[in-house]
Regions:
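Divalent cation-coordinating acidic motifs and surrounding scaffolds
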Residues: 1-130, 135-210
Length: 210
């Protein structure tokens, strides 16, 4: 999909090992949007702030949906993700930073709910599925997660107790179960004001139960 950020999600593969087809799912929404997992390059409607008014949600980098076939004939679906960053870029002052951080987390969670709707559709059809990419989020990554109950990663993995409805990522599981704060990381950032590095688990490969 074209992206206003000029950053489009790509898939590198060996054509001798995989046959790959771009396979967008969901119906394109109208300009007003849809509540029912529309195509990722259109508009999703979701009530971000519990005021009974749904807002328009869009991806600046729409997820890439592919149908893959191995040489042995195994078929699977892949969704490549680059979710919204929660960083309060451009906000000046502590209050503005907090306000923008919360607003960005709401939007990021809505994007993850949109992806989760798509995941549930694939699982209901019995598809083998991989969801992978940069979620710009992870279990326990910041204090604002407590306001919403779950991280975006947990939403995409699935919160229902039935294992048939859940995706699995062993690194995410380690982060969720860790009691001592020792978790895998996939990204490292330098915080200039504090003169230190910050490490986080932001990138995931989630697979269906099969």
């Amino acid at each position: 999909y074209p992206s206003e950020t000029e950053q489009e999600i790509a898939f590198l593969y060996d054509p001798d090992r995989l046959t790959v087809r771009h396979a967008p799912q969901g119906a394109p929404s109208t300009s007003h949007g849809s509540h029912d997992a529309p195509r990722f390059d259109t508009t999703f409607r979701y009530d971000l702030d519990a005021d009974n008014i749904s807002e328009s949600i869009r991806f600046s980098k729409p997820p890439l949906e592919l149908a893959l076939t191995t040489p042995g004939g195994t078929k699977l679906r892949l969704i490549g993700v680059h979710a919204k960053s929660k960083n309060p870029y451009g906000a000046i002052g502590r209050e503005a930073q907090i306000r923008l951080s919360i607003e960005n987390r709401r939007k990021q969670l809505a994007q993850c709910l949109w992806i989760r709707q798509r995941v549930e559709g694939h699982l209901a059809h019995g598809d083998s599925l991989i969801v992978m990419g940069d979620f710009n989020d992870g279990p326990g990554i910041d204090e604002f997660e407590k306001l919403f109950g779950h991280s975006g990663v947990e939403i995409v993995l699935g919160t229902h107790p039935d294992p048939a409805t859940r995706l699995t990522d062993p690194h995410a599981s380690m982060a969720l179960q860790s009691k001592v704060g020792i978790t895998p990381t996939s990204a490292r950032f330098y915080i200039a004001q504090q003169k230190r590095f910050f490490e986080a688990l932001l990138d995931f490969v989630m697979v269906s139960p099969d």
